Amino acid sequence: MQHHQTLYSLCLCLASFSLISLTSCDRPHKGEEDQLKQTVDTFASAYFNWHYKDALQLVDSASRKWIIYAASNVHQADIDSLRAMPEGATFHIKDIDYTSDSTAVAFVTVKNFLAMDTIGTASHTVESAKFALSLKYEKEKWHICLTSLPRPMKEHH
């Protein structure tokens, strides 16, 4: 009888653990996905339309230098090109890959944006490009993390 009670207790514990594991799979990351998407949307709109002051609010502290760098390299010719564009950049989040419970990568397609390639050269319009934007969750919010200025992903043929 003692053996059956122990076996029953063990099965009950395993069932409880399995249930907890299954329900925790519904949310394997911190923060809400809606908040993550909102961060990506707002950042993409600000950054790719050259509203760097707004983009600055959405990056982590280590990334601020990249936004400041981009803003410091805007010239009058760039401003004139931006004003001449019939509409601003548009974008679409293609996918989100959660790399851990507090980090993610958002894959974004950006269309009709003005790109600054090389410092000192004129910017040019890009019809479409894909970007991978890294994010991390800290202080109850998702933040964009930059290790350089965002660059288009290379196409694999």
Label every model-predicted segment.
Residues 6-7, 32-33, 82-84, 119-123:
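Intrinsically disordered, low-complexity segments enriched in polar/charged residues with Gly/Pro
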Residues 15-17, 29, 149:
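Extracellular/secretory pathway and lumenal proteins
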Residues 1-23:
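Sec-dependent bacterial lipoprotein signal peptides
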